[in-house]
């Protein structure tokens, strides 16, 4: 008889915990952060330095991109402009107003329009990025990679950085502000 009471209490505790944990988990994954496995060579050596033998898993922060707080050097997950069923992970090279020297895009120089980003893979020869499809709308950004969480040997925070040879030539909006500043 005592066994039956224990079993019922255990079952009730499990069910009540389940009905609390599931909505909390769904909310966290939907609003705050989620994890993604990085496949391919486009972000080497920053991500997946060993190739497919040990793919990196990253924590993607949704909260930081909700209000379009994206900066140069961030690694972001975006919906592919060419295939909306696919998410791609790339580095932000330019933000709105920046002039970018492209790598094989139809125009040699591009001004990133308002509400857009210029994204590129770190491994230029193996990346399908803005050099192929142009600037990307901020609305396509799903998250900013904040940490590598797998494999354990690579646990680390991901800091924003832009390779020196890929920095924007000029930010048109900032140059206009400097030109007309009355200080």
Swiss-Prot record:
User: Is Acyltransferase among the key words of this record?
Assistant: no
Q: Where is this gene product found?
A: Mitochondrion inner membrane
Membrane-spanning intervals of the chain: 13-35
Main EC class the enzyme belongs to: hydrolase
State the UniProt keywords alphabetically: Hydrolase, Membrane, Mitochondrion, Mitochondrion inner membrane, Protease, Transmembrane, Transmembrane helix
GO terms of molecular function: endopeptidase activity; serine-type endopeptidase activity
| PROSITE patterns with a match to the protein in the record | SPASE_I_3
Query: Mind telling me which Gene3D superfamilies this protein's record contains?
Result: Umud Fragment, subunit A (2.10.109.10)
Q: Does Protease count among this protein's keywords?
A: yes
Q: Where is this region: Disordered?
A: 161-183
| Composition bias, Basic and acidic residues | 164-183
So what family is this one in?
A: Belongs to the peptidase S26 family. IMP2 subfamily.
Subunit composition? Heterodimer of 2 subunits, IMMPL1 and IMMPL2.
Protein function: Catalyzes the removal of transit peptides required for the targeting of proteins from the mitochondrial matrix, across the inner membrane, into the inter-membrane space.
Record-given protein name: Mitochondrial inner membrane protease subunit 2
The scientific name of the source species is: Danio rerio
